[in-house]
From Swiss-Prot:
One of its GO terms (molecular function) is nucleotide binding. It comes from Sambucus nigra (European elder). This is Ribosome-inactivating protein SNAIf. 1-alpha repeats lie at residues 329-369. The lineage of its organism: Eukaryota, Viridiplantae, Streptophyta, Embryophyta, Tracheophyta. It is an enzyme of class 3 (hydrolase). 2-gamma repeats lie at residues 534-567. Expressed in fruits.
């Protein structure tokens, strides 16, 4: 009888453990204590620090690509380090806790009021380690955008983001019960929190839009560029990690602008200027180093990356690519008259689709046109690769736009900004006439947002630049970013952002473009805009926008040196 009673007890226990329809079972073990990063909507100025803290928690290793952190693959993350908990609180005091996977920044579950909800197809790792002291239930849809939008009934392009939307989303997640049946408010709330947490951690462009909306207590709907970023984070990460050391992508990242026009991005520099991508999904890692370097000499050795994921390794080699090269004044590197003869001059010409502007970047360090090598001699020319010293045909492309011949240490230079100008090799003074971009030869028109989310503003030649509130379509705040590294007044592209000299506290003004060292700028992954000639960065003087002064200054890491480009100011 005692045995029968015990068996009945075990049967009843098993049945009770199933709970209501949709409830989950898991192995009852002591769960790990996962790190937590919280955000309270009543502290609007804490949104940026909240995202920095979240990024620090999900980045477990020191693997980087072009100075951007790369998340660890699943095979290298233990269950005890797999998740980060993110409690979100709205002004009404409602709190919901998200569980975020450190492998991909996905929201995989959420919990509130003693209940937790997992997406359809949740894994044992998730169920056995997350919210085990709650009643676990499984939703009848997955966490991807297609599934969530299907539940809502329309796309996220129509769903506002901002403090009001986030507050409502938190309440929707907190009050949801599986028995209620209506998943539309829940799915809508999930679309809001995923974009305002995970996507903002992936892209500083998205962070800026949301941070501005929180500061201004306003709402906005995602533009098509933002949505295309969200849809292409994986492909961006892959292209960046497989790129040649100079940032040349093996393929093309397909984005859309705000008017739904296609944008084809073929190098890291342009992709970063468009998206300010902040974190990469793991794809490829260098074999010989844990990061790619921007240093021209170190970059001579092309590092062959390896794909690690799913318990296997797959070699992911750097490949040859064929691209145009844009330089001073937006002119392209061109073989004179397209003549296929040894010694023919390499010059500047208007960018077009001509064959004589298509250069192949080989993994042996050569740059070739129809098989002939870009070659250094008394001038820069094309020549049979097999009949000249190999060191005369080697080049290193850096992400700052410098193209260096390692043997001489000299860099590719355009002596004049004129069609037909023969290229030369000169000492590197980091001048704009020595700046180049591979692929993406058209200038990018953008706003430049800095301290207190205000926009860089100009008032014509021989005047200072300063910060003012951003105003959509204000021509004084529109800039054209050229492949030569210049920042030009979009309404008059003969005018360049210029440092008066190259010493700390020198003012930044607008002058005629001359291809000089004080007119070349680099948008860095740490958020600064540096002048490589001076080795100083753009700085809002004394962190005081009322002074109306932007200066050169040594890097400090302070907010008054942080900048971001955006084609759609918030």
């Amino acid at each position: 009888m005692r045995v029968v009673t015990k068996l009945l007890y075990l049967v009843v226990l098993a049945i009770c453990g199933l709970g209501i329809h949709g409830a989950l079972t898991h192995t009852r073990v002591t769960p790990p204590v996962y790190p937590s990063v919280s955000f309270n909507l009543t502290g609007a100025d804490t949104y940026g620090p909240f995202l920095r803290a979240l990024q620090e928690k999900v980045i477990l290793g020191n693997h980087t690509a072009f100075d951007l952190p790369v998340l660890n693959p699943e095979s290298q993350v233990s269950d005890s380090n797999r998740f980060v908990l993110v409690p979100l609180t709205n002004p009404s005091g409602d709190t919901v806790t998200l569980a975020i996977d450190v492998v991909n920044l996905y929201v995989v579950a959420f919990s509130s009021n003693g209940r937790s909800y997992f997406f359809s197809g949740s894994t044992a790792v998730q169920r056995d380690n997350l919210f085990v002291d709650t009643t676990q239930e499984e939703l009848n849809f997955t966490g991807n955008y297609i599934s969530l939008e299907r539940q809502v009934g329309f796309g996220r392009v129509y769903i506002p983001l901002g403090p009001k939307s986030l507050a409502q989303a938190i309440s929707s997640l907190r009050t949801y019960t599986l028995s209620a049946g209506d998943t539309k408010p829940l799915a809508r709330g999930l679309l809001v929190v995923i974009q305002m947490v995970s996507e903002a951690a992936r892209f500083r462009y998205i962070e800026l839009r949301i941070r501005t909306s929180i500061t201004d207590a306003s709402e906005f709907t995602p533009d098509l560029l933002m949505l295309s970023m969200e849809n292409n984070w994986s492909s961006m990460s892959s292209e960046i990690q497989q790129a040649q050391p100079g940032g040349i992508f093996p393929g093309v990242v397909q984005l859309r602008d705000e008017r739904n026009n296609p944008i084809e991005v073929t190098n890291f520099r342009r992709l970063f200027e468009l998206t300010y991508i902040a974190v990469l999904l793991y794809g490829c890692a260098p074999v010989t180093s844990n990061s790619y370097t921007n240093n021209a000499i170190d970059a001579q050795i092309i590092k062959m990356p390896v794909f690690r994921g799913g318990g296997y390794e797959k070699v992911c080699s750097v490949v040859e690519v064929t691209r145009r090269i844009s330089g001073w004044d937006g002119l392209c590197v061109d073989v004179r008259d397209g003549h296929y003869i040894d010694g023919n001059t390499v010059q500047l010409g208007p960018c077009g689709n001509e064959c004589n502007q298509l250069w192949t970047f080989r993994t042996d360090g050569t740059i070739r046109w129809l098989g002939k090598c870009l070659t250094t001699s008394s001038s820069v020319m094309i020549y049979d690769c097999n009949t000249v010293p190999p060191e005369a045909t080697k080049w290193v492309v850096s992400t700052d736009g410098t193209i260096t011949n390692p043997r001489s240490g000299l860099v590719l230079t355009a002596p004049q900004a004129a069609e037909g100008t023969a290229l030369s090799l000169e000492n590197n003074i980091h001048a704009a006439r020595q700046g180049w971009t591979v692929g993406d030869v058209e200038p990018l028109v953008t706003f430049i947002v800095g301290y207190k989310q205000m926009c860089l503003t100009e008032n014509g030649e021989n005047n200072f630049v300063w910060l003012e509130d951003c105003v959509l379509n204000r021509v004084e705040q529109e800039w054209a970013l050229y492949g030569d590294g210049t920042i030009r007044v979009n309404s008059n592209r003969s005018l360049c952002v210029t440092s008066e000299d190259h010493e700390p506290s020198d003012l930044i003004v607008i002058l005629k473009c001359e291809g000089s060292g004080n007119q070349r700028w680099v948008f860095n992954t740490n958020g600064t805009i540096s002048n490589p000639n001076a080795k100083l960065v753009m700085d809002v003087a004394q962190s005081n926008v009322s002074l109306r002064k932007i200066i050169l200054y040594p890097p400090t890491g302070n907010p008054n040196q942080q900048w971001i480009t955006t084609t759609q100011p918030a």
